[in-house]
Swiss-Prot record:
GO terms for biological process: mesenchymal stem cell proliferation. Belongs to the SCRG1 family. Keywords: Glycoprotein, Secreted, Signal. This is Scrapie-responsive protein 1. PANTHER family: SCRAPIE-RESPONSIVE PROTEIN 1, SCRAPIE-RESPONSIVE PROTEIN 1 SCRG1.
Amino acid sequence: MMKSVVLVILGLTLLLETQAMPSSRLSCYRKLLKDRNCHNLPEGRADLKLIDANVQHHFWDGKGCEMICYCNFSELLCCPKDVFFGPKISFVIPCNNH
C-alpha cells in the first residue's frame, strides 16, 4: 500500500515538473491594441503588413505568410491562414514577404 502511494506521488511530481512540449500546429490568439484604433495600423508596427489594399483590416503577422490578423475594433484576432480563409482558398491570398 505504501509503495503504491509513493509511486503515485512520484508520478504526479514528475508530471507536474515536466514542461509540456509546444504544439507544432499554430493556433489563434488575440492582441489588444494600445490606442484601441484599427485605422492607423500598421503604422509603428513592423510585424504587421497589409495583405492587400482590397482586403481591408487584414494583415500578415510576422515575417512569414502563415498568420493573418483581422483588426476588430480594439483588438487584433490572429489565426493561421487556413483557419481564417479555409484550405481551399488560402493558397490564393497574395503574400509579399520581402
